[in-house]
Amino acid sequence: MDLCFQNPVKCGDRLFSALNTSTYYKLGTSNLGFNGPVLENRKKKKKLPRMVTVKSVSSSVVASTVQGTKRDGGESLYDAIVIGSGIGGLVAATQLAVKEARVLVLEKYLIPGGSSGFYERDGYTFDVGSSVMFGFSDKGNLNLITQALKAVGRKMEVIPDPTTVHFHLPNNLSVRIHREYDDFIAELTSKFPHEKEGILGFYGDCWKIFNSLNSLELKSLEEPIYLFGQFFQKPLECLTLAYYLPQNAGAIARKYIKDPQLLSFIDAECFIVSTVNALQTPMINASMVLCDRHYGGINYPVGGVGGIAKSLAEGLVDQGSEIQYKANVKSIILDHGKAVGVRLADGREFFAKTIISNATRWDTFGKLLKGEKLPKEEENFQKVYVKAPSFLSIHMGVKAEVLPPDTDCHHFVLEDDWKNLEEPYGSIFLSIPTILDSSLAPDGRHILHIFTTSSIEDWEGLPPKEYEAKKEDVAARIIQRLEKKLFPGLSSSITFKEVGTPRTHRRFLARDKGTYGPMPRGTPKGLLGMPFNTTAIDGLYCVGDSCFPGQGVIAVAFSGVMCAHRVAADIGLEKKSRVLDVGLLGLLGWLRTLA
């Protein structure tokens, strides 16, 4: 889940400490399923860089001043400019860079990663967002984080998590999601023995979808040569995915399961994936997460989640591309309706053949293209999807002795009433990454990272003193709930605490209202209404959680892979057919209108 971005210099709601000069890495090649021919006039591919194993996160950056790039009627300096360095943007950028595209990533803050970043305080290294890392195994085709790192010669040491999450639910229902699938099924069926066949049926369908996805080479679904090639190679797998594309997890679950409490448990499973219940969660998204946790397992990177983005950024530079920090993009420049560049807050301009926005679609079309008429397809997107709520987040350091020796790393707490699952402050998600990696905290200490849904409307308009008082009050009530349910004496064991609100997330993540991402207005037709990477504006692409397939680490990495492939085709680094492109993109656009 995406949480407040706190940079290495200041944190929470303190003023951001600006630098007088932009910082950047002039960072180089490999590939992630991109094996198509490149233009003949491109230089020969460089060798895959020596694999670098990353063991820890450092907040150091390389500082330099970079001047804006102006067009003089000649070729644009860059093949692609990526706005933002979240995981989706970095995967897209690195995948283009390994094909020897010239890429510039522009990041508003001091470090890469966005909600997958980190910050350091008083000897602690805190993950900004989720510590549950999917797509980080050493096998299959859905280990997209591992593949993305490998593509730029990077490998991170990881620690396997034996339990994905420990659920603490109403009616004293306690369920551990064990790494081994058989152990998980055994535990769940022991709680619901009368639903054993239903449990096997629902999760069996999840495996059908996961195995189909995992058998395919993952590229852009908007590129017809690839798409038709995959269909002819794997027709049954493609038809399976097409069958489930418009379906939701809750509807599938109800085909197999009748017990209302078990269905509520599946709602909680999906809520972690999508911040909505199972009836609103696309079956494909649910299946990716509910199976990858057993297939490849949850693996935590040594030194913290922030090392992923840092390693991708360094790998990008190794490929000869660039990433600039303190580069706040304020607008996208259009020339006769085509996206040709970006303008920064300090007035500098950069130009490229293509622009890739890692901002949300609301921020892209509502702010970066402010004043432009909203394209019809974006109007349709906003009819189907709304902004999900944001989060209240609490980063704490506590005395180690307050946690029992057998404490799991991740917990989901909903104590009293299933109806509170989606309510503000109703559910609590807790990560304790020091259970896996003690190096993140001083000796004798643990990190507790707590978050719960909250809307920005609950925090707007408050004077500073009232705002700070409310943060402390809400945080205290959340901590008291955990103290009562899990860890007696928790409040008195706290040695460090910082609280972030939706206002914090809006400021540091540059996300409208601090939103977690898109969620459907009603019951969606699976993923049918979710837009891909191309947009109605020539030369402009979107990447991240407001693109297919949506929210989550695997999903945004997949979005980055797809975006890079489509852009590569459009700038001549992959095969393409203009005739087939027009037909496929038209068909996909029409299908989205059915959602």
Swiss-Prot record:
Indicate where the modification N-acetylvaline is found in the sequence: 57
Disulfide connectivity for this sequence is none
Which domain of life, per UniProt? Eukaryota
Tell me, what is one Gene Ontology molecular-function annotation carried by this entry? Answer: oxidoreductase activity
Show the SUPFAM superfamilies listed in the entry: FAD/NAD(P)-binding domain
- Which InterPro entries does the entry link to? Amino_oxidase (IPR002937), CrtISO (IPR014101), CrtISO-like (IPR045892), FAD/NAD-bd_sf (IPR036188)
Where is it predominantly found? plastid
Keywords for this protein: Acetylation, Carotenoid biosynthesis, Chloroplast, FAD, Flavoprotein, Isomerase, Membrane, NAD, NADP, Plastid, Transit peptide
Q: Where in the cell is it found?
A: Plastid, Chloroplast membrane
Q: Which GO terms describe its cellular component?
A: chloroplast membrane
Transit peptide located at 1-56
Cofactor(s) listed in the protein's UniProt record: NAD(+); NADP(+); FAD
Which pathway does this polypeptide act in?
Answer: Carotenoid biosynthesis; lycopene biosynthesis
Provide the membrane topology annotation.
Peripheral membrane protein
What is catalyzed by this enzyme? 7,7',9,9'-tetra-cis-lycopene = all-trans-lycopene
The role this protein plays is: Carotene cis-trans-isomerase that converts 7,9,9'-tri-cis-neurosporene to 9'-cis-neurosporene and 7,9,9',7'-tetra-cis-lycopene (also known as prolycopene) into all-trans-lycopene. Isomerization requires redox-active components, suggesting that isomerization is achieved by a reversible redox reaction acting at specific double bonds. Isomerizes adjacent cis-double bonds at C7 and C9 pairwise into the trans-configuration, but is incapable of isomerizing single cis-double bonds at C9 and C9'. Carotenoid biosynthesis is partly required to form the prolamellar bodies of etioplasts.
Family label: Belongs to the carotenoid/retinoid oxidoreductase family. CrtISO subfamily.
Q: What is this protein called?
A: Prolycopene isomerase, chloroplastic
* Gene transcribed to yield this protein: CRTISO
